[in-house]
Amino acid sequence: MAELNHPLNFGRRTRKYDDRWRLTQMRKRVALVRQQLHRLAQDSGVTTDGSQPVNHPVVHEGNGTLRRVRVRLDYGTDGLDVDLPDERVTVIEPVLRPAVPDAAATLTTALRAPIGCSPLRQRIRKGQRVAISVCDITRAQPRREQLAALFEEMPDVPRSDITIFIATGTHRSNTDAELERMLGRDILGSCRVLNHDSRDTASLAFVGRTSTGVPVHLNREFLHADVRITTGFVEPHFFAGFSGGPKMVAPGLAGLETVMTLHDAGRIGHPNATWGVTDGNPVHDDVREIATMVGVHFAVDVTLNRDQQITAAFAGDILQQHRAACGYAKETAMRAVEEPFDVVLTTNSGYPLDQNLYQAVKGMSAAAKIVKRGGAIVCASECRDGLPSHGSYGAILASQPTPEALLAMINSPGYSTPDQWQVQVQSQIQLKAQVLVKTSGLSASEISAAHFTPIDDVAQTVDSALKRAGAGATLCVLPQGPQTIPYLRESLRS
């Protein structure tokens, strides 16, 4: 991973903004006024909408006083306000990217000036069957906008010849109500929509093996379409490097055997299987190769901001456009720090990613990049969908008494169970730091059974963790969870 040109100074009383994304002088003045008003409101005991801290694009640090600062955490759909010791806290967020002024126009421009291939209009004709993959309910993809733009570029293709594939991977099928929220009645009423099922062997076709031996079983109907298109959104991924692009083929539309091999203990445990790394990442290398084997004809990816608004669109050859999108997302999300922190407070980016504890491991993984060994990670994730109840995650956790025992089991020869990859990453994190979890959707006993420490009050928990760490203890907050990927500058890869 090449070093990013984001010079940061993490001194206690200094602040430097990213040169590339420096705010205009007027916006700086507005931000300063808002911050001063916020402090005045705190001093007077007043809480108003304006009392929330200014969301700086890079870092907000304490000013050396004993006052507390209010930080808004992404939690469920409503968020969670937490008051933290101002002199201790460093808040790190992605570079502030405004929404594009016209999402439809931005998508159309990308589709008509694609990267690495000819425009979609020139690649499709009447009578062809079209397959389009989209993310499942756990992802905040703007599906309707992307599909609408694609439909405009396929004027001669009737909706009855288009099938939308929900790229669930090994996740559960999405319900009718969820599909309506995701796609809308118009698309549901005019296009065929299919939930992919990785366990339904009759719906799969064997394509071959990758150069590393991964058996490639993919959705048969997707493969048999005349035109295969993927849509997604790109953000850092905790072991695949980045989401979107080729991941919308595998694991998105892959069979269970393929997913299990892509996510085996050796690949997940590889040092390059991490946030923001693609080249040399064994997971991403295989995923790219699978997409090439399939022959995807066109791909559309977007990047999003905190409000789940489109900030950029990319289209064209699945690998070339994805590489461009990854570069853009990396500049937004990857933030360098000089030293690890005693305590890191994180989230799982709010709804829909924080629907369950399984997904919350991603937020913990982001925090683990910069927490001191023996430190504490505090994770606030709503988990309205529980563990969840489907899948093997809960059963694996219940099968062993400690994270150490879980890792030993997963790394033992011949062990292979769906969802083991999430438990593997979770256990690796827990060997480095204590993990304390705030959730509204799980009981304290359920959190404890998952080998975490349950908490009710985030601020009190942070205070206690800082006290245990001793004088001069440091605190970092990732309000947007894995939308921000901090890393130690010394750990940069080329």
Label the predicted regions.
Residues L4-F10, Y17-R20, Q36-R39, D43-S44, ...:
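Alpha-helix boundary/capping motif
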Residues N174-F242:
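An acidic, phosphate/nucleotide-engaging active-site surface
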